[in-house]
Amino acid sequence: ESFEVEKLNLERERLIDLFSNNGIYNFQQRSIRFKAFKDSTGLDKKIPILLEINNSKIRNQELLLDVPYVIKKINSLSVFVENPEKSFRIFTDSINIDGFKIFSTGNLKYNPKIISNGIAIKKNNPYSLNDRKKTYKYFNELQIFKYPSIVYRENIKDSTKLDTEIYL
């Protein structure tokens, strides 16, 4: 098979997709490196390729820390629904449904099932970028919420878990 940079780019995209949809939260593209080795004698026309997947790099003040990737699972899921008629942002109502809690400013104006049906993110499942995209798509297509957003926070007690908040 001939050496083509485009094939390496496609493989990089495949790996990013694989990691990002199987629990690796914030996988960094720059963690993937390909090294090509050429026979200096010119006898072997094949070019061996070495794939390196490095740990993530996180800046902590003056230091650059090397942090291994770990699979992160969804620990909790909360949905916050704002009533556009209310000028304050105090959530006064809540309901438990399908393993998560929906908070609202005032009485919830929407059927909770309409909200829960669109959430592809599930408690105890590994983080998945595709689940995040599906959830965004659902709420954007409803066209009843202005700026849906999804926030993931590393759990304080267990760094392998993510607490998820959806703002509608």
Feature-to-residue mapping (PLM):
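Immediate N-terminus of the mature polypeptide
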Residues: E1-L168
